[in-house]
Amino acid sequence: MSFRFNSQAFEDNSFNEKIREKLTQALNSSSSDSRSPKVTKTTMGEGSTSKKDSGSGGKSRKFDILKSGITVSKVNFPTTPQLEILDLDISAQPRSLVKGICKISCKDAMLQIQTEVEANLLLVYSECSPSFATPNMICNDSFTIPITMVFSEIRLEAITNIFVKHSGIGISFNDVNLDFKFDCSMKILQSTIERRLKNSMHHLFKEVLPSVIFSMSQSLFLSEAARNQEMHNESRGDSRPSPRVVLEESDLQELSPANMLRLSTLISSRQTLSLHGTVLNVPSTIPGCLERQNLHRFNSRIPSLSNYYASYKEEEKSRQVEVKKSVGSSVPLPHTSFAANPNLLPVRTLQEGAYDLPTITGIQNRIFERSTDENERPRRRKLKIKMSGRKQQPQAPKEEEPKQAEQQPETEPQQQRLLPTPEIPSREQASTPVDIDPTVSTPDSPDTEITSPKPLSIRNPILSDVEKMDSEDASAKSFVAPLKLPVSITSKYFNYPADHISAQTPRRYSPQRINWEDALFNTSELSNLRTSLYSPIARGSLLNPTKERPDRGRILDNRRLSFVGLNFKGGKWGDDDDPPPYSG
């Protein structure tokens, strides 16, 4: 079963006006119970509040940012709603006449709401919080912002239970499908309000809309006398005289031009969100307090070299910005000391010579006067220059210098006469002894100073690379300090053959007598290790060359050797002898 609504009733503006009034009344009545205390007057952060006690005093008060009531300014139904009756129960019950289940669908509806909210959330929380937990604010005045919300393209599909009673129509929504577009005049608060509206839709269809429909249906069930009585009561309420503001002579002083100017600046500051000097309790009126928006002006008036040469500073900043854009943000730019300390001259002023010394002196004096006391004396830099001449040295030592130069060539042949430098024998002449002139006699005194002969570069195959490097460094030195030989050393000390000299090599580099024919050293692993490139003793001349075994590739392919050196345990070493290079 279904029926159609009269389309002319929806096209008539009177129906929209009734809907607008009923929605306004329903929204304000539902929000009045849960509204927080409204601030009526604020003085130095302390406000007097008018509280509305709810039914139960034990419930906690909810924070509400609504400053005024909700006003539905416009309602429009371009498309006629549709109502479909799914189930109907007509029974002679004492409480209801008709009971049914219906499906309601509405499309392209529009609703516009206007209200005012409190922008100072600190005031809302401070008035609803205990006094011991609320700090004393310097400026905690109320600041209201008007907001207009428009709901367009509303699409509603719902399953409802309808109860027709003697006094009106009761309705409840079971299954609701709602979609709409939301637009707010405050774009900053649009996302927040939209999120809160979605959470409050349950309250809207559970309490607000049923009360609106029931109040509108009462006009159909009330008698004519009751309707006339209600209209008469409304007219009496409208005919009450509105209260007038009566000003006394004492109040005229508060309406002075200065107070009116102060009130006008207060209103303009709330509308533009700006702070003026005429408003009380703002940082600009507090002595010694500086606002953030005026900080650049204060810095520009400070006497400093950077402010006097501001044009050079701006050019350097623009140049750094251009370099940063061209190079990229990943490359760090060098930090200039001029940017860190503003009381410095730019480099360009020094290069171009555009500075003025009297001006710089005046700026420095003003900075010193502002930062120090009058009784404090400035610390001047003093430069002391001694004008005393240098003492002239006597010329007597200059005459002695040529004498010393003449004596030096005489001492050199004497040293050569004491001990001639022996020639370096070659490897072929290593077996021949080194002969020294027998005519040279050693002095009898034990502390005879003689020059040491140049060391003999005898090639020993057993010496390691480290010993060779030491011998080369020793031979490279051109100057050798004079040596003092003991009395026991005579000229016969230098007549030993070269094989005795080679026997004086360090013990750790001397060859060890090892029996290589032992069965311990003839294993396949050690034989391959001697002839392989990776052997640490492959270059030594002590190993006997042997033929390569056929299994040599097994060790060469596997380069991850499981040993460090030769595990030689057959030789017995004394306490005085050094161990071999590779010992287990």
UniProtKB/Swiss-Prot annotation:
Query: Which superkingdom heads the taxonomic lineage of this protein's source?
Result: Eukaryota
Q: Which molecular function term from Gene Ontology is one that the record holds? A: lipid binding
Q: Does the keyword Mitochondrion apply?
A: yes
UniProt lists compositionally biased (Low complexity) regions at: 405-416
Q: Where does the record place Basic and acidic residues bias?
A: 368-377
Q: Where is the composition biased (Polar residues)?
A: 25-43, 439-451
Q: Where is this region: Disordered?
A: 21-60, 368-459
InterPro entries from the UniProt entry:
Mdm34, SMP_LBD
Naming one, the record's GO cellular component terms include: ERMES complex
Q: Which GO terms describe its biological process?
A: mitochondrial genome maintenance; mitochondrion-endoplasmic reticulum membrane tethering; phospholipid transport
* Signal sequence region: none
Q: Which residues form the SMP-LTD domain?
A: 1-218
Task: Recite the UniProt keywords alphabetically.
Answer: Lipid transport, Lipid-binding, Membrane, Mitochondrion, Mitochondrion outer membrane, Transmembrane, Transmembrane beta strand, Transport
Location within or outside the cell: Mitochondrion outer membrane
- How is this protein positioned relative to the membrane? Multi-pass membrane protein
Q: Write out the biased-composition intervals (Basic residues).
A: 378-389
Subunit organization: Component of the ER-mitochondria encounter structure (ERMES) or MDM complex, composed of MMM1, MDM10, MDM12 and MDM34.
Q: Its biological function?
A: Component of the ERMES/MDM complex, which serves as a molecular tether to connect the endoplasmic reticulum (ER) and mitochondria. Components of this complex are involved in the control of mitochondrial shape and protein biogenesis, and function in nonvesicular lipid trafficking between the ER and mitochondria. MDM34 is required for the interaction of the ER-resident membrane protein MMM1 and the outer mitochondrial membrane-resident beta-barrel protein MDM10.
- HAMAP family, alphabetically? Mdm34
Q: Family membership, please give it.
A: Belongs to the MDM34 family.
UniProt domain comment: Lacks alpha-helical transmembrane segments, suggesting that it resides in the membrane via beta-sheet conformations similar to those predicted for other outer membrane proteins and porin.
What is the protein name stated in its UniProt record? Mitochondrial distribution and morphology protein 34
Which organism is this protein's natural source? Zygosaccharomyces rouxii (strain ATCC 2623 / CBS 732 / NBRC 1130 / NCYC 568 / NRRL Y-229)
Name the gene for this chain: MDM34
